Amino acid sequence: MAIPHPSSLIPPGASRREDLRLVTGAGRYTSDWNLPGQLHAAFMRADRAHAEIVRIDASKALAHPGVKAVLTGDDARAAGFKSLPNAISSPGKNGQPMVKPHYPVLASGRVRFVGEPVAMVVADTAAAAEDARDLVEVEYRDLPAAASFDAAVAPGAAQLHAEVPGNLAFEYESGDAQAVAAAFARAKHTSKLTMDSQRLIGNMLEPRACLVAYEPSSGSYSFHVPLQGVGGMRGQLAAVSGLDKGKIVIATQDVGGSFGVRGPAYPEYFAAMLAAKQLGRPVKWVGTRGESFMSDFQGRALSLTGEIALDADGKFLAIRFDDRADLGAYGAAFGSFIATRNLTVTIGGVYRVPALYARTRLAYTNTAPVSAYRGAGRPDIAYAIERLVDYAAHEHGFDPIELRRKNFIPRDAMPYKTPNAGTYDSGDFEAVMDDALKRADWKGFPKRQAQAQRAGRLRGIGIATYLEAGGGGAAPKDEVAVTFEATGAMTLYAVTHSSGQGHETVFPQIVAAVLGIDAASIRFHPRPPAAELVGNGTGGSRGALGTGSAFHVLGNKLIELARPHAAAKLGVPESGLGYSKGKFHAGRRSIGFIELARALAGTRPHPLDTTAEGVYGTSYPNGCHIAEVEIDPETGAAAIARYTAVDDLGHVINPVLVEGQVHGGVVQGAGQVFGEQAVYDPDTGQLLTGSFMDYVMPRAGWLREIEVHDHPVPTPTNTLGAKGVGESGCSGSLPALVNATIDALRPLGITHLDMPYTPARVWAAIKSVNRDS
């Protein structure tokens, strides 16, 4: 029988079941957990960007009351820890591999960025550990710092790693350089623009922390740690420590924000493992906000120079990019992958472009390592493409809307194979744009602009027709499991972990919708009951299309698994048994699924306990975002006047969760456009934006008027037809808001500014053109 799609069965207003627990303070984050006899850790961190470690004197710290140990890089090296992981696997230019210098648990011989952990103090109390940390004395021999890509690759620059001459880690190519060059040679119009996607700091609500206990009889460790997925974190901890994954048990419950920053295993976690083993007691570390600013892996840090070639009618002939990526001091986790594969997978955007090419150079600098931040490269390339298209339209006299329309990949061309070997599964880009134009009242903008002008404000409108790649993951498949209780209630399991996405709500809803039962009888737990499940964590906009699709398969499997038991209970052959609305039925006789599960509970393991799996590839969420921005020319202050988002996310399972994800992504994009930037002193490498006094976060009042609408074109790549939503808001908002801001400034002669558009930067640009005129 046909099983109704879950999206047709979940009530439109279905709320998040975890919210009441979290907003009333009943959540349990890593810092809320304690173990008997636990010790507390504090880290002494580098106060300079680049220096040799001449000597570490921990004698005063060790003499401080309550201190149990002070560990340094020598101790970590003696313990045999391997380098922290780096995910890059793609070959570089001419097949050259990336140079990956050792990333130590604690600095050994040299410090390479402000905030790098140098020593760990372990004491009876957190206060004692923090006091003793300040007593650790380190003698340094200062070295010149290179705090940016340009400084790092300049002739004579200070070398961060002996094995990386010139600090250039890698050069990556994608596409056909010769075909692109030929297209540019015959083009009627060309445009070129350099766009910076500045370095950002994740600033999750919950700072990083860990609680580690060692069990000597089994040689195993138990962890409480903020993460994005049990499988990924366990794999990294095992790889660096040299342990079997079965020796690492993770018991995390709630996680307060992630944005990609939680995915990697950090040095502090391994140092805590070492201390817990050596001292025979659990070790707890809770980072401060200042430590997060300095030592959390950061995001973006890209500069993209884009060029586009057009014929006389405005048809795109080729696009090419020359990109520069700042990796920070080490190749951390996903940083190099983001700047290469992730940055180029959607290089053509939503457009039919015959020839594509990108070159990316990656350099080590004396700054915090760079890894994933919401979107992980895809918002950067979406911003660059949409900004470049808008720039070319105005430079060569094309209407920005019609130029896009002329070059869209049509719906009937799907699946569409791109010139750089990607395949877009589905989409209707023109229809999505037309939907957005109507909802945003694009034609009514001149009236609103005139009203703003009469009030002394500059008003602009910007559009972005973005494309995202959702569903990336390192695991070969997504496995899920279910167990049943005596009451017939069930618990779902997967290794993905929520940091605000609503897993406790949506995964039970999917299974309940397939079974036709109340979701209240189902709960979700992000850890398997016994055997390890294989699967991807929360990241890459994968939750619904990967884990969610596996739960959809599980729901259907449960019906078939229960069928012979239902037939036996009803005394009918399986062939005569139907299933609908949560019940098996044969004629007038029926038995409910929960009733059947309850009746089978006497057998252990429960006959319906089972697993399901699926292999789900990439899908391509897309959409059209339209923003209107007003600027006060006297102060340079910009305000978002209207915002309309129309997104093709495939089948929408829970509209409430989707709207929240889009809102959050748009606000994070607004943060990057109008305020956020991690700034390092170019001479010393000191972090100048190390607190909320200096680092501008988005404000609630920035986005008062936002409309979110769905325009679903289901994907065939997974059983739910879902495309993913977590990072789409960032990918759409960056170019839409930038294009709107530049549109407001264009009458003054300003055609481009780099982000962030702070009042000071916008005001300076306005004054500059006023002086020139």
Question: Locations of the language-model features?
Answer:
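Active-site-adjacent "gating/activation" loops or surface patches in catalytic cores
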Residues: P226-Q228, G470-T491
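Thiamine diphosphate
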Residues: S258-G280, K284-V286, H503-V511
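Flexible, low-hydrophobicity surface segments
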Residues: M1-P165, Q278, I631
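Short acidic, glycine/serine/threonine-rich loops at helix termini
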Residues: F81-P85, A132-L135, V225, R234-Q236, ...
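Conserved catalytic cysteine-centered active-site region
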Residues: G109-V111, D244-T252, K277-T288, S292-F293
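Short glycine-rich loop/turn motifs
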Residues: S108, E206-L211, S303, G460, ...
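Glycine-rich loop/linker segments at domain edges
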Residues: P12, E18-R21, A87-P101, N167-C210, ...
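C-terminal catalytic domains of large/alpha subunits in multi-subunit enzymes
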Residues: H64, G73-D74, A87, Q96, ...
